[in-house]
């Protein structure tokens, strides 16, 4: 292949090149001829780009605009506290009501800017003049010459307020457009004009308007004043920041050349002939690399410009990702970028790309097919197939900058979208209403349609996670993507202990992680049933250093059961070695030297990828309960491929903790919506019954009553229609059979983990406390939150599953190995939950008799060193409804109590329908009769508690009488 042929295929015929037929001078060589041609190419590129070079330091002098070229929020104008991004385009309010203006004003012409909402709460966005003064009560729209729209309250503001627009949602793009020539202001939501908001605004001499936003506490948004292309440009309106036209022209040329080079390089990767240039002594591949460097050195500075990154780079990457070549063009492109771009250029390039994809993904979809979300996931997945890029994104972006959990979410459609999909609404009623029941088939079909659309997005999300969990891209010098992901996920889960993230996002993330785990487990391990062996809780293979254990504090357990640990692990195991070193260090009163002490076990050094005197010690000390410096895991990542079983079990462990910390809350939240809907249904049925009675009355006074009742029924119908559409989404996305089966599968895993750990005698004490909490959470989720919408009978072998759990609860109630106070309470409340539910009480009655008698015996023990109220409550439940004083669901004197309603949660304080158990009544009788000494002790404890309770009650009554008398 000739040099001229290569160059002209890439750059065209205008490049002046030395002809190969020209006889070179004596001092010329083949090498110098290649250099001359490369210089010619470089000069051609610079000359061509110079024709479109932007003029330096030119002021944006468009008529009607005042201010600097680069538009951003002006921190000198802020009122209240904000968190603001480095580029001063994203803000988060930290005061009750905070206001900030941009640094550019307009006085003539038509102008616009866009805001992407990060939340949906109280925000006023619009325009104001320089003379408008704001405080923590007054924001934009609350003063004379300021104008605003608030989609939270669906109103427009200019001192007075009027209904305007439509409700907004997180991810919405709100455009704010001002026409200074005609004195009008308009707002658009996701490209749809909301109508004329204001007319005849004050214009003329001395009046220039600044983009202005006012946000309530924790509300947040990101502005686009023109630094990137407008998502929904409005014809005739200009962005406040001008597009970099010359740089766009340069980038267009460069990326066209780069595409041709990439295609040639890619095509030659599978070609073995003509490796050397015909007219030189350089390989074709090396010459192509020289050309690539010549082009990419000009691309580098351009991709750091946000507008170029979004307008040119992202579509370019999208184009490459759609090619069907082998190897993929995109991977070749990324290889070249990593080779020739500067580090900071590559960082900005990837960050701009991922931030754009996240912005597009978070945008509220107008179509059920989620085209923008699928497109973003497709492209991110393709990018992550490149090893170096994937590892960089995991280390620096997906957890630290953009939160990968946002890519795991599937947002509901807005009200209009749901109404288009769920045209006919239905809800369960008893007795059934024919006018509602006729819509059932259509409603359930709509639910299936939603579920099908969601499942396509979920499949892409799981595919992305599987790629991020790649375990084959490490070597002796670098960790795998899985190692990075697990470390970052652990920190992400721990952060949720202290912060409150959006609940729907966390639940979606939980389900995707669980499905990805099962896909990887089946592919790499394949054993069944799945559970976490107890050894993982005491051999430091999984980091539980920041976690309470069932048996108490980890360092105490290590000391108490040292001999057993040594027998199980061996005297040279890293856990034993670390304990010895910690003991030696404490003897010289110098805890800070723990990091300097060597781990003598060479096996562990190989696992962690450090030498015996390396920095891996911190990890082991922390994992066995010693914290030499801080609680942050600063140990080096393990190098090379991880053990598939151990690494996936670590992932599963994090998933279980993640569910316990946050994911369970969303299930409870949607259950509240379902219960609220049930209350509306009951209220409407009662109102209809009253209407029928009123119709039978002939008194004219009842005519007005009928009108009022009809109005009330219409209000209920409107609310129920809205809730029924939301429930359609919940049925498809949260309470689907697939999601229910995932929760049930995880419950079996947790139950089997606890059951097998219990067989290891004292080692059971090392089980992290959140496993017992997760057992309770998963039981409640299946039994109370998902059921009856997702009937528990759908779960295969659900009775056997709950029977195993019930037996575990009976056997481990008051287990001496469980020392942690919270764990004791959690186990007791889980047992109580089984007692008050008819389904699980029946299962509890079918556990082996030995286990039933054991739990009753423990319940009847005296109240030394344990909570007595919960035990009494369980005992009382065995009789409630089976005796003259226990026949009420709610005490009569409380049945008409007026006051705020409590959230419906599983709690012993909630009124519950009686559900007596003759089986356990008989066990209580038998245990009391067979153990007279223990019975006497129990009765003494009961009488003491009654004496104390009555004394307190009488004392309070006397004090009340004294206060009322005075």
For each of these PLM feature ranges, what is it?
Residues 1-370, 374, 379:
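PRY/SPRY (B30.2) beta-sandwich protein-interaction domains
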Residues 119, 243-762, 768, 772, ...:
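Long amphipathic alpha-helical scaffold regions
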Residues 235-241, 537-548, 677-690, 806-807, ...:
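Eukaryote-specific, cytoplasm-facing alpha-helical/coiled-coil scaffolding segments in long proteins
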Residues 253-311, 875-965:
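Extended alpha-helical scaffolding regions
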Residues 292, 317, 337, 380, ...:
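Hydrophobic core/packing positions within alpha-helical solenoid repeats
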Residues 322, 346, 519, 523, ...:
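Flexible helix-coil junctions and inter-repeat linker/turn elements that act as hinges
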Residues 508, 766-780, 798-800, 818-832, ...:
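Alpha-helical solenoid repeats of the armadillo/HEAT superfamily
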Residues 669-677, 731-738, 786-802, 816-822, ...:
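HEAT/armadillo-like alpha-solenoid scaffolds in large eukaryotic assembly and transport factors
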């Amino acid at each position: 292949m000739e040099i001229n042929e290569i160059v002209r295929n890439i750059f065209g015929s205008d490049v002046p090149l030395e002809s190969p037929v020209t006889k070179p001078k004596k001092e010329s060589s083949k090498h110098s001829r290649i250099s001359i041609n490369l210089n010619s190419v470089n000069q051609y590129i610079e000359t061509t780009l110079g024709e479109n070079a932007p003029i330096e330091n030119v002021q944006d002098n468009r008529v009607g605009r005042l201010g600097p070229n680069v538009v951003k929020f002006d921190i000198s104008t802020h009122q209240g506290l904000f968190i603001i991004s480095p580029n001063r385009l994203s803000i988060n309010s930290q005061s009750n009501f905070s206001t900030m203006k941009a640094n550019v004003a307009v006085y003539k012409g038509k102008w616009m800017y866009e805001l992407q909402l990060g939340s949906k709460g109280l925000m006023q966005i619009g325009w104001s003049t320089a003379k408008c003064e704001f405080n923590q009560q007054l924001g934009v729209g609350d003063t004379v010459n300021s104008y605003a729209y608030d989609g939270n309250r669906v109103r427009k503001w200019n001192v007075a307020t009027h209904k305007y627009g439509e409700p907004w949602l997180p991810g919405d793009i709100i455009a704010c457009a001002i026409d200074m020539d005609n004195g009008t202001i308009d707002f658009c939501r996701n490209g749809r004009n909301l109508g004329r908001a204001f007319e005849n605004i004050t214009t003329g001499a001395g009046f220039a308007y600044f983009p202005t936003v006012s946000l309530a506490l924790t509300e947040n948004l990101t502005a686009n004043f023109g630094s990137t292309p407008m998502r929904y440009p409005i014809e005739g309106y200009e962005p406040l920041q001008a597009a970099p036209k010359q740089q766009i022209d340069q980038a267009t040329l460069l990326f066209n050349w780069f595409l041709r080079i990439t295609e040639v390089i890619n095509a030659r990767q599978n070609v073995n002939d003509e490796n050397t240039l015909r007219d030189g002594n350089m390989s074709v591949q090396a010459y192509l690399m020289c050309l690539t460097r010549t082009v990419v050195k000009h691309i580098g500075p351009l991709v750091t410009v946000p507008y170029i990154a979004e307008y040119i780079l992202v579509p370019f990457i999208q184009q490459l990702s759609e090619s069907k070549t082998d190897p993929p063009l995109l991977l070749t492109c990324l290889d070249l970028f990593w080779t020739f771009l500067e580090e900071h250029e590559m960082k900005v390039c990837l960050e701009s790309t991922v931030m754009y994809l996240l912005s597009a993904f978070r945008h509220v979809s107008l179509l059920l097919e989620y085209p923008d979300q699928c497109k973003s996931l497709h492209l991110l997945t393709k990018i992550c197939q490149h090893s170096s890029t994937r590892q960089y994104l995991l280390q620096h972006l997906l957890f630290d900058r953009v939160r990968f959990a946002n890519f795991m979410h599937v947002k509901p459609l807005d009200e209009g979208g749901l109404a288009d999909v769920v045209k006919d609404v239905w809800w369960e009623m008893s007795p059934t209403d024919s006018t509602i029941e006729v819509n059932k088939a259509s409603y359930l079909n709509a639910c299936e349609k939603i579920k099908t659309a969601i499942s396509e997005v979920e499949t892409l999300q799981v595919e992305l996670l599987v790629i991020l969990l790649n375990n084959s891209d490490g070597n002796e010098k670098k960790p795998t993507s899985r190692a990075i992901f697990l470390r970052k996920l652990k920190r992400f889960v721990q952060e949720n202990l202290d912060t409150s993230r959006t609940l729907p996002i966390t639940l979606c993330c939980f389900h995707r992680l669980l499905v990805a785990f099962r896909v990887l487990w089946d592919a790499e391990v394949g054993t069944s049933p799945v559970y976490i062996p107890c050894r993982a809780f005491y051999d430091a293979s999984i980091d539980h250093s920041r976690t309470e254990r069932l048996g108490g504090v980890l360092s105490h357990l290590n000391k108490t059961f040292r001999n057993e640990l040594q027998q199980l692990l061996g005297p040279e195991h890293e856990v034993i070695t670390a304990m010895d070193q910690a003991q030696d260090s404490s003897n010289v009163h110098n805890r800070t030297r723990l990091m300097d002490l060597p781990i003598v076990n060479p096996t562990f050094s190989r696992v962690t990828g450090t030498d015996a005197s390396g920095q891996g010690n911190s990890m082991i000390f922390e994992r066995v309960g010693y914290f030499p410096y801080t609680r942050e895991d600063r140990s080096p990542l393990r190098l090379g491929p991880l053990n598939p079983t151990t690494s996936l079990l670590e992932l599963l462990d994090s998933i279980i903790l993640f569910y316990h910390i946050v994911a369970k809350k969303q299930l409870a939240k949607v259950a509240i919506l379902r219960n609220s809907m049930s209350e509306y249904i009951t209220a409407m049925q009662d109102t209809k019954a009253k209407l029928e009675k009123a119709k039978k009355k002939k008194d004219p006074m009842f005519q007005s009553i009928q009108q009022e009742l009809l109005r009330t029924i219409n209000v209920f119908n409107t609310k129920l229609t809205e809730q029924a559409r939301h429930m359609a989404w919940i049925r498809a996305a949260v309470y689907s059979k697939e999601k229910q089966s995932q929760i049930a599968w995880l419950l079996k895993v947790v139950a089997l983990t606890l059951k097998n750990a219990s067989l290891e005698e004292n080692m059971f004490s090392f089980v992290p406390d959140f496993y017992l909490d997760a057992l309770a959470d998963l039981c409640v989720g299946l039994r109370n939150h998902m059921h009856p919408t997702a009937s528990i009978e759908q779960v295969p072998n659900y009775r056997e599953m709950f029977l195993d759990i019930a037996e575990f609860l009976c056997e481990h109630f008051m287990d001496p190995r469980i020392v942690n106070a919270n764990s004791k309470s959690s186990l007791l409340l889980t047992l109580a939950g089984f007692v008050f539910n008819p389904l699980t009480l029946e299962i509890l009655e079918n556990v082996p008799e030995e286990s039933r008698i054991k739990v009753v015996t423990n319940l009847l023990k005296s109240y030394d060193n344990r909570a007595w109220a919960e035990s009494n409550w369980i005992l009382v439940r065995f009789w409630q409804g089976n005796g003259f004083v226990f026949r009420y669901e709610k005490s009569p004197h409380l049945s008409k109590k007026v006051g705020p309603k409590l959230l419906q949660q599983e709690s012993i304080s909630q009124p519950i329908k009686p559900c007596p158990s003759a089986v356990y009544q008989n066990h209580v009788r038998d245990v009391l009769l067979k153990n007279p000494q223990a019975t006497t002790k129990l009765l003494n404890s009961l009488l003491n508690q009654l004496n104390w309770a009555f004394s307190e009650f009488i004392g309070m009554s006397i004090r009340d009488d004294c206060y009322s008398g005075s």
